[in-house]
Regions:
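Residue-level detector of functionally pivotal "anchor" positions at catalytic/ligand-binding pockets or at interdomain
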Residues: 424-439, 536-547, 696-721, 737-742
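Short, surface-exposed loop/turn motifs with a glycine/proline- and acidic-biased composition
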Residues: 762-797
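Intrinsically disordered, low-complexity Pro/Gly/Ser/Thr-rich segments with frequent PxxP/GP/PP motifs
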Residues: 473-505
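Terminal processing/anchoring signals of secreted or surface-associated proteins
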Residues: 1, 487, 623, 673, ...
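Metallocarboxypeptidase
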Residues: 227, 244-432, 474
C-alpha cells in the first residue's frame, strides 16, 4: 500500500515537473547570442528582416556594423543572407551570469542622481537590479499606502494568456475621480517586450519623481494637480515572468508573450495591434519568429486589455516605452509615411535635445518596418504617440546604468505630461520702436510666447525678464499675458518690458537678459537672450514669407524650401527637409542669390534663429562665405558651432537658438553666403531649420545720421558735402519735408563713378527735418564719388572728392 502511495506521489511530482519543464524549458529558439553584422546599406537591414531575423533595437550603424541579439535558428538563417558576421557573445545566459558587478564609484553616481532628482522611493529590484512582476506590484501598493491622495488603487485591465493581471494606476490630485474634462489624460506603458526592463525602470522612476516631489517641487505639483497620468508598467507579465524563471538574476532574452502556438510559444504583442497589422515586412506569420504577429489583429488578451483601456481614457499623448536603441520613433512604422509631422517634429526637437536621441519614423531611424504596433494604433485613435527606445548598453543594462538611463529620459516624460494639456513656452523677441538701443536709451522689449499644449488654455501666464547687463536698469521687468489658447501665439505688444541704459553702455556691448515664463505661478520656460548695443543697419533680410525667391538650391538629396513646421510667429522656416527627415548621402547647398556688400561697414554680422537634429559628428550643416563669387567657400564659426575635422559645423541636436556670426574679417569686400548640408549613410536626422535671416551692420551712432533741427524744409534738400575735397571724414546734409505720413523711408548711398555701390549710409524711416551724416572714407581709395538721396519719388545726386 505504501509502495503504491509513494509511486503515485512520484508520478504526480514527475507530471508537475514535466509540465513546468514544458512551460519553462529552453530550446534552441531560446538560446541567444550577440552577433555583429557588416552591412553596406539600409537595404541589407530589410534583407535581414525578410529572412525573419529580428533586427529590432540593434546597436551600431552602417559605418561600424550593427549588433543584434538573435537565437540559434536566426543565426542559421543569417548564413543564407550572404552578409559577413561575427558572433561576439555566443551564450548570453552565461555572459549575464558572469559579468562584473558595478563599482562603488558607479553606484555613487546613481545615488547622486537620486539626490539631485529628490527621489527617495525608487530602489533596485532583485532581477539584476530590476523589479520582478511581483516586486512591481508591491511597489504600486506601497505607493498607494505612502501617497493615497496622489495615486489610485491599482486597476486590473485584464488577464494575460496565463492568467496574470495587467495593472494600471493613475497619478493625479484626485486619483479616484475621472477629471479628464478639466485635466488632460496622459498615457505611458512599458514592457510589451519582456526583455526590455529598463523601459519599466524609466516609468517607475518618473512615478516616484512625481510622488516624492509633490508639494515641494512646483513642476511636479502642477503636473499632479492638472493632469491625469496613467501608467501600465508591465504590459506583458507572462513573458516577463518567464524571464524571471529562466534568469532570476536578469538577462532573460524572451521577448513575446507566452501564447502556446502548438509548435512554438509567443506572440509579439507589439505586432498584434489592429492598425497596420500584417502589412509589409514589419512582422512575421511564423509562430516561431520573434516578431510573430498572431493569428489575427488584436488576438491576444494583453493587447485587448490595453486597447480597451486607452479607448476608455482617451489620452491626448503617450509614450509606449521600449529599449535599447536610443531613439524616438514616431508613426508610422509599417510604411514610409510620416504623419502629422508638424507636431511630431516640434515636440521631438524639444525633448530629444535633452538626451540626444534622434527621432523620426522607424524606417528613417532603424531602416526596417514594424507593423501592428502600439504606437501606430494609438495614433490611429487620435493619440499622439511615440516609441522611445531608451538607451543603455544592452537589453539588460548593468545595475549601475538603471538610474542614469532613467534620469536621461525624465525630461521627455515630463515634457509629454506638459504638452498634453497647457504648456507655455518662450518663442522669440523684438525690440519695439526703432528696433535698436543705444546708451541713455530705453529698451522696449516685446516677446512672443506660445501655448504648445494640445489641449487646455494656459492661464495666468506671466513673463519676467532679468538683466545680466550692469548698465541696464529695469523700469518694467514683468508682464501679464493672462491666458493663451492651445497651440496659439501671443505677445506683449503695447505693454513692453522696459530697461533704461546708462551712459556707460558702450557701442557693441552684448547685453544678456534671462526670460522666465510662468503659468499659474510655475515656471515653464527659461531662456537667455542677447542684444547688442548699437544700431543694426539691415543689409539683407528674409523671413521666409515670400518663399525661396532670394535663394538658389543645388546638390544631392532633398532640396531646401520653406516649411510650416514649428515656425516663429509671423514667419516661415527655411529647412533642408520640409516634411520629414533629411536623406542619407546628401550634399546640398542653399545659396543667397544676392551679393552682400560689406564695403564701408564696421561691425557686420549674420543673424538668424535655428534648430537642428543631425547625427553627431557625421551629419552637419555649415554656413559659408565666398569672396570670389563662389569659386571657394570658407565655413564660419558662430555661437553654436562645434568643430568637425577642424571646421565649424552645426551637428547633434539643438532646439531653437539665436545665432550671430561675426563678419569683421570681410569688411570692405563683397561676399556670397550659403548653407551647406552634408549627411552620410547612417541615421538621417530631422535636419536644419532657420528663420529671420539677416545680414546687418552695427554702427556707432556717433557717426550716423543726426537730426540737426526741426525747421522742416518745404521740399527735399540734398546739400553739398563739407569739407570737399575731404580726408577722410566729410559731412552730408539733407532735408526731409512733411509728406502724407509722419515719417518717410529715406535712402542715402555712395557710389563710385562706374555706378558700383560703395556704402549704404541711411536706409530707414525718418521724420521731417534736417539731417547730417558724418561719412568716414578711410576704408576706400582716393577718387571722385557720388552720393544719392532717395525718398518716395524724389531722387538727387551730388559729387564729392576724397584726397588722401
Amino acid at each position: 500500500m505504501k509502495t503504491i502511495k509513494y509511486l503515485t506521489l512520484f508520478l504526480v511530482t514527475f507530471l508537475v515537473i514535466t509540465g513546468l519543464n514544458a512551460q519553462f524549458s529552453k530550446n534552441p529558439l531560446e538560446s541567444y547570442s550577440l552577433v555583429k553584422i557588416s552591412i553596406n546599406s539600409n537595404e541589407d537591414i530589410i534583407r535581414l528582416q525578410m529572412n525573419d531575423i529580428t533586427v529590432e533595437h540593434y546597436r551600431g550603424n552602417l559605418k561600424s556594423g550593427i549588433e543584434l541579439v538573435i537565437n540559434q535558428a536566426e543565426i542559421s538563417r543569417l548564413a543564407n543572407t550572404g552578409l559577413s558576421y561575427e558572433i561576439k557573445i555566443k551564450d548570453l545566459d552565461s555572459y549575464y551570469q558572469n559579468r562584473s558587478k558595478a563599482s562603488q564609484t558607479e553606484m555613487q553616481k546613481s545615488i547622486n542622481i537620486l539626490n539631485q532628482d529628490n527621489i527617495s522611493g525608487f530602489s533596485y529590484g532583485s532581477m539584476g537590479g530590476y523589479f520582478t512582476y511581483d516586486e512591481m506590484i508591491q511597489k504600486l501598493d506601497s505607493m498607494r499606502i505612502m501617497y493615497p491622495n496622489l495615486i489610485s488603487v491599482k486597476q486590473n485591465l485584464g488577464f494575460s494568456n496565463e492568467g496574470r493581471e495587467i495593472w494600471a494606476v493613475r497619478i493625479s490630485d484626485n486619483p479616484g475621480i475621472n477629471e479628464s474634462e478639466t485635466e488632460a489624460p496622459i498615457y505611458f506603458d512599458a514592457l510589451h517586450h519582456a526583455r526590455e526592463p529598463q523601459a519599466m525602470a524609466c516609468l517607475m522612476y518618473y512615478m516616484y519623481w512625481l510622488l516624492d516631489n509633490y508639494g515641494t517641487d512646483p513642476e511636479a505639483t502642477y503636473l499632479v494637480n492638472n493632469r491625469q497620468i496613467y501608467f501600465v508598467p508591465i504590459a506583458n507579465p507572462d513573458g516577463y515572468e518567464y524571464n524571471n524563471f529562466t534568469n532570476p538574476e536578469g538577462g532573460g532574452m524572451w521577448r513575446k508573450n507566452r501564447k502556446n502556438n502548438g509548435t512554438c510559444f509567443g506572440v509579439d504583442l507589439n505586432r498584434n495591434y489592429n492598425y497596420g497589422w500584417g502589412v509589409n515586412s514589419g512582422s512575421s506569420n511564423d509562430p516561431c519568429s520573434e516578431t510573430y504577429r498572431g493569428l489575427s489583429a488584436g488576438s491576444e488578451p494583453e493587447t485587448q486589455a490595453i486597447k480597451t483601456f486607452v479607448q476608455t481614457i482617451h489620452p491626448k499623448i503617450s509614450f509606449s516605452m521600449h529599449s535599447v536603441a536610443g531613439r524616438y520613433l514616431n508613426p508610422y512604422g509599417y510604411n514610409d509615411t510620416a504623419v502629422n509631422y508638424d507636431i511630431y517634429s516640434e515636440f521631438s526637437s524639444d525633448f530629444a535635445a535633452s538626451n540626444n536621441y534622434y527621432y523620426g519614423t522607424v524606417i528613417e531611424m532603424l531602416s526596417y518596418y514594424s507593423s501592428g504596433t502600439t504606437r501606430d494604433y494609438l495614433h490611429s485613435t487620435g493619440t499622439y504617440s511615440w516609441t522611445p527606445e531608451v538607451g543603455g548598453s544592452d537589453f539588460w543594462p548593468l545595475q549601475s546604468e538603471i538610474i542614469p538611463v532613467a534620469n536621461e529620459n525624465l525630461y521627455g516624460l515630463k515634457y509629454l505630461s506638459w504638452v498634453g494639456g497647457a504648456y507655455t513656452d518662450y518663442v522669440n523677441y523684438n525690440i519695439a520702436g526703432n528696433g535698436f538701443v543705444n546708451a541713455n536709451d530705453t529698451l522696449n522689449l516685446q516677446i512672443t510666447l506660445k501655448n504648445k499644449g494640445l489641449s487646455m488654455t494656459s492661464k495666468n501666464v506671466t513673463a519676467e525678464v532679468t538683466s545680466l547687463y550692469s548698465n541696464a536698469t529695469p523700469l518694467n521687468s514683468s508682464v501679464n499675458f493672462d491666458s493663451i489658447q492651445a497651440r496659439q501665439f501671443k505677445n506683449n505688444s503695447g505693454n513692453f518690458l522696459k530697461f533704461k541704459l546708462s551712459s556707460a553702455a558702450a557701442y557693441m556691448d552684448e547685453m544678456k537678459f534671462v526670460v522666465s515664463v510662468k503659468q499659474e505661478g510655475v515656471e515653464t520656460s527659461r531662456d537667455t537672450i542677447r542684444i547688442n548695443v548699437g544700431k543694426p543697419i539691415v543689409i539683407f533680410s528674409d523671413n521666409g514669407l515670400n518663399g525661396i525667391s532670394k535663394w538658389t538650391r543645388a546638390g544631392t538629396g532633398l532640396l531646401w524650401d520653406t516649411t510650416f513646421i514649428d515656425p516663429f510667429y509671423g514667419s516661415k522656416n527655411f529647412a533642408d527637409s520640409r516634411f520629414g527627415n533629411s536623406k542619407n548621402s546628401s550634399n546640398n547647398t542653399f545659396t543667397l542669390s544676392d551679393t552682400i556688400n560689406l564695403i564701408n561697414t564696421n561691425n557686420p554680422r549674420i543673424e538668424f534663429s535655428a534648430k537642428w537634429a543631425e547625427e553627431t559628428n557625421f551629419d552637419y550643416t555649415r554656413i559659408q562665405v565666398s569672396t570670389n563669387f563662389g569659386s571657394t567657400w570658407t565655413s564660419l564659426p558662430g555661437r553654436h558651432t562645434t568643430l568637425i575635422s577642424g571646421t565649424p559645423s552645426y551637428t547633434s541636436i539643438k532646439r531653437w537658438v539665436s545665432e550671430q556670426i561675426n563678419l569683421n574679417s570681410y569688411i570692405g569686400q563683397k561676399i556670397r553666403i550659403r548653407f551647406n548640408l552634408v549627411t552620410d549613410n547612417g541615421v538621417p536626422g530631422d535636419g536644419f531649420y532657420f528663420n529671420n535671416f539677416k545680414v546687418v551692420n552695427y554702427k556707432d551712432e556717433g557717426t550716423s545720421v543726426v537730426l540737426t533741427n526741426l525747421n522742416v524744409p518745404a521740399e527735399y534738400k540734398l546739400y553739398q558735402n563739407y569739407p570737399n575735397p575731404f580726408n577722410p571724414v566729410t559731412h552730408l546734409e539733407f532735408g526731409i519735408p512733411v509728406m502724407q505720413g509722419e515719417s518717410e523711408l529715406v535712402s542715402l548711398k555712395v557710389y563710385d563713378l562706374l555706378g558700383k555701390e560703395i556704402a549704404v549710409l541711411v536706409n530707414e524711416k525718418l521724420s521731417p527735418g534736417n539731417y547730417i551724416y558724418e561719412f568716414d572714407g578711410s576704408k576706400i581709395p582716393s577718387g571722385t564719388y557720388i552720393y544719392k538721396l532717395e525718398s518716395g519719388n524724389f531722387s538727387a545726386v551730388r559729387k564729392m572728392i576724397l584726397l588722401k
